[in-house]
Amino acid sequence: MTVSRLEPSRARAIAFETSAVGILRTVNSAQATFTASCASGFYASSMLDLTRLPADGSDGYMSPEFNLNTIYKSGYRFRFRPGLRGASPATCNGVQPGRSATTYYIGAEPELADGRRFFGTNQGGTVYQSSSRIQDT
């Protein structure tokens, strides 16, 4: 029986990749909940909008640590970009009319040399991966 062993740097890269995909899925889930329950079918146009508390006192849609459009976490740089803003009403958490978006994109780029995969997702909910930077969709 042969036992294969990952080099520590590759094992770390896999752990970072797994974390990055998890964060992207969390953003998709937060956006889906925000659009359905708070924003009348529109998406948050910033990560800060997802961390704002609704007027009813319930929790925000994302943890406050994700309150910037560019964050560094688990070996990745995450960049959030809103799509076009629409004729949106005010949201349940204080986003002003016309400030919510019709689409969004968030990409994850490895910060470290041992990171090999880039990830991205948008309002469609699919997480894409590539060996090079994924263009905003």
Residue ranges: model-predicted function:
Residues 3, 130-132:
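Short beta-strand-to-coil "C-cap" segments at the C-terminal boundary of structured domains/repeats
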Residues 26-116, 121-124, 131:
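Extracellular/periplasmic head regions of type IV pilus-like filament subunits
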Residues 1-35:
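Amphipathic alpha-helical segments typified by the pilin-like N-terminal helix
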Residues 1, 120-121, 137:
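Short amphipathic beta-strand/extended segments with alternating polar/hydrophobic composition
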Residues 7, 134-137:
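A short acidic/small-residue loop/turn micro-motif
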